[in-house]
Amino acid sequence: MATNSSGDGKNTLYCSFCGKSQHEVRKLIAGPTVFICDECVELCMDIIREETKASGLKATDGVPTPKDICAVLDDYVIGQAMAKRVLSVAVHNHYKRLNHAQKGGDIELAKSNILLIGPTGCGKTLLAQTLARILDVPFTMADATTLTEAGYVGEDVENIILKLLQSSEYNVERAQRGIVYIDEVDKITRKSENPSITRDVSGEGVQQALLKLMEGTVASVPPQGGRKHPQQEFLQVDTTNILFICGGAFAGLDKIIAARGKGSAMGFGADVRGNDDRGVGEIFTDLEPEDLLKFGLIPEFVGRLPVLATLEDLDEDALVTILTQPKNALVKQYQRLFELEDTELTFTDDALSAIAKRAIERKTGARGLRSILEDILLDTMFDLPGLESVTEVVVNEEAVNSDAAPLMIHADASKEPASAG
């Protein structure tokens, strides 16, 4: 123990680290058999702060290469090779730009926000979620359809940054390097190509409100939400280094692109072209910024999304792969459900192809696969818990394309159609 008996019989206490007495410091904190003074506490805090800052810089220096990012995306997202390449390069350059800004330099690198365009169910949201997981940065998703201008009923755009803060546990420094994914951005287009003379608070008004946020501004964010707690202190968040990814299905944009490609010639010498029978995703590859303006995005908004990544329709092979290959594939999920009933669930190759074809016909992409499987297996899942000796359920092409029930294999190996309650 750091004590010393003086001549007058009183014990003087000393700091166990620097050796100063209790009379030389403002505060001496006692621990089990040791003491530490306020000066040593401050010194320790400075050391920890510096080491934390240094380790943080090292972590941000190690940005994965575009090939590494693309390889991880391949593990989670089926197909979309071109979109993955565009995203991998854009994200790598974004975080390289942040490291460049930390080190200082004469040339300031501009931010490149990303616009993902593709049919519904093709993997736009999953790509953004996977990117955030790879980079280990705060990530939040916002639905553009719920946003309105400040002062109107609905969500303010600042709430997007509040969600990002919440995902970073209110660590402002970390949130300022995060990723924001704004879904359904095609639903906030203005109603006509010409500027509106009336207020459009959920369309063009939201685009205007998002401009500064996406370009870079210091946003005043209410930690508890702005409208219910008007007296609270605001947090200041700089959005300059936040990467914004916007996504949408843009239904009808393919017709605008196709019309631009056709032209409108008339007469005997006109170049008459047939109907464009390409898929929506293929047509999107010919996208130009002017097409987005015709669709209803304002020029300033398009200008703040310089990186365009178009996603293709998922073909039959891709949908079959989605059904069977990923770690949490739908087929594996239903097989696990049947295992809980001590029954094996199998799908024939023809059945998987038929399920994929039906999803393509519905134009729902990968998102519609679960509802198709539910339709096929509903009666079987209803009857199975009350049946005994069923060891296997086989889904064949007939069960997918007609009202026939999947086959049930009993312990005696005889096959019979499943009875629909």
Swiss-Prot record:
All copies of domain ClpX-type ZB, residue ranges: 3-56
Cellular component terms per the entry's GO annotation: HslUV protease complex
Gene Ontology biological-process entries: cell division; proteolysis involved in protein catabolic process
Annotated positions binding ATP: 119-126
Family matches, as PROSITE patterns: CLPX_ZB
Classification via CDD domains: RecA-like_ClpX
Keyword Zinc assigned: yes
Positions contributing to Zn(2+) binding: 15, 18, 37, 40
Keywords noted in UniProt: ATP-binding, Chaperone, Metal-binding, Nucleotide-binding, Zinc
InterPro entries cross-referenced by the UniProt entry: AAA+_ATPase, ATP-dep_Clp_protease_ClpX, ATPase_AAA_core, Clp_ATPase_C, Clp_protease_ATP-bd_su_ClpX, ClpX_bact, P-loop_NTPase, Znf_CppX_C4
Gene Ontology molecular function: any one: ATP-dependent protein folding chaperone
Superkingdom of source: Bacteria
Recorded family membership: Belongs to the ClpX chaperone family.
Assembly mode: Component of the ClpX-ClpP complex. Forms a hexameric ring that, in the presence of ATP, binds to fourteen ClpP subunits assembled into a disk-like structure with a central cavity, resembling the structure of eukaryotic proteasomes.
HAMAP family membership: ClpX
Biological role stated in the UniProt entry: ATP-dependent specificity component of the Clp protease. It directs the protease to specific substrates. Can perform chaperone functions in the absence of ClpP.
Name the record gives this protein: ATP-dependent Clp protease ATP-binding subunit ClpX
Organism from which the protein derives: Roseobacter denitrificans (strain ATCC 33942 / OCh 114) (Erythrobacter sp. (strain OCh 114))
Organism lineage: Bacteria, Pseudomonadati, Pseudomonadota, Alphaproteobacteria, Rhodobacterales
Gene: clpX
